Amino acid sequence: MTLDVGPEDELPDWAAAKEFYQKYDPKDVIGRGVSSVVRRCVHRATGHEFAVKIMEVTAERLSPEQLEEVREATRRETHILRQVAGHPHIITLIDSYESSSFMFLVFDLMRKGELFDYLTEKVALSEKETRSIMRSLLEAVSFLHANNIVHRDLKPENILLDDNMQIRLSDFGFSCHLEPGEKLRELCGTPGYLAPEILKCSMDETHPGYGKEVDLWACGVILFTLLAGSPPFWHRRQILMLRMIMEGQYQFSSPEWDDRSSTVKDLISRLLQVDPEARLTAEQALQHPFFERCEGSQPWNLTPRQRFRVAVWTVLAAGRVALSTHRVRPLTKNALLRDPYALRSVRHLIDNCAFRLYGHWVKKGEQQNRAALFQHRPPGPFPIMGPEEEGDSAAITEDEAVLVLG
């Protein structure tokens, strides 16, 4: 998606970025960061398209301390990206350039944009689609942690989508190496995705610090957000939102959760553990039953004629299934006596009879509410199924109805 160009998006002059211009031709603006702009660019020799992140590091915009901080963070990001190069779900760094005034990072061009924008368009994702995205994300996080790298800024805005809707983790500006047993104390990241230990660490000088577990908390927030269309921790007053995070206060109360499985709710609860020691690791999360469900096989490569035949067979099969479902099957006396409530037609008669006797619906369980299914009483007595014998009544009496209902 092309963005409008403002004064802050002006391209560096040739002298300030000669090495970059010799190899790439910058095009339209496709994204912006706090201190950077992202443009589509074309490799002059091959014509291939990429994305370039351009950061201005001049004294006009930043103090000397800020200049050095930006340069150091970019160098660290470049080093980490080169270390993790080749992973299918991590953005690939193609080139990097540094001049006295600008820094350039050239990446693969992810045409589908951010996961955040995709979620905004869809409102909420299905469990199937969420499963695919979260599996890829956790595989990337597991790879980072295995290489002693913590991301520290996982969120939908930093997850990009390629042409095949596969994700790539990006924006490693807050990432750093973390040796086993080492702890961090720096407050960084996005408020709604911060783990409780990061907040506690910033408030308590005696706090031991935080580790890689903060990435798994963020994964839990992302998982919740994809399914609900809104984050688990939010309040218009940020101080109250941060308190909710530190106490782990969230609920599955919105209507979207009515159709979500208990399995995915369990995974969320295991990721959003306030105690980092009780939180799942990336490897443990990938072993959760939520990811064990069958994703389906790859589609066949069929010719147009074969696809047409499959479509015809599908329509014929659907018609036969519908016919079989609605065909009235013979009802035996033994089946009726064994479990009358298991038969739909008889069940309707029983429920309506109960309403006539008691004046209200008779529930068969605490979770059962059948009132919406039976809104009209029958116009007359219920016929007895099966042949009548001499002396039998042609209608069910009230005493017989009570006996059937037990």
Curated annotation (Swiss-Prot):
Enzyme class: transferase
A GO-annotated cellular component: cytoplasm
Annotated segments matching region Calmodulin-binding (domain-C): 346-370
Keywords associated with the record: ATP-binding, Calmodulin-binding, Carbohydrate metabolism, Disease variant, Glycogen metabolism, Glycogen storage disease, Kinase, Nucleotide-binding, Phosphoprotein, Serine/threonine-protein kinase, Transferase
GO biological process: generation of precursor metabolites and energy; glycogen catabolic process; glycogen metabolic process; positive regulation of glycogen catabolic process; protein phosphorylation; signal transduction
Recorded consequence of changing S253G: No impact on phosphorylase b kinase activity
Residues at the active site: D153 (proton acceptor)
Keyword Membrane among record annotations: no
Sequence segments annotated as region (Calmodulin-binding (domain-N)): 306-330
Top-rank taxon, per record: Eukaryota
Involvement in disease: Glycogen storage disease 9C: A metabolic disorder manifesting in infancy with hepatomegaly, growth retardation, hypotonia, liver dysfunction, and elevated plasma aminotransferases and lipids. These symptoms improve with age in most cases; however, some patients may develop hepatic fibrosis or cirrhosis.
Protein name: Phosphorylase b kinase gamma catalytic chain, liver/testis isoform
Organism, scientific name: Homo sapiens (Human)
Gene: PHKG2
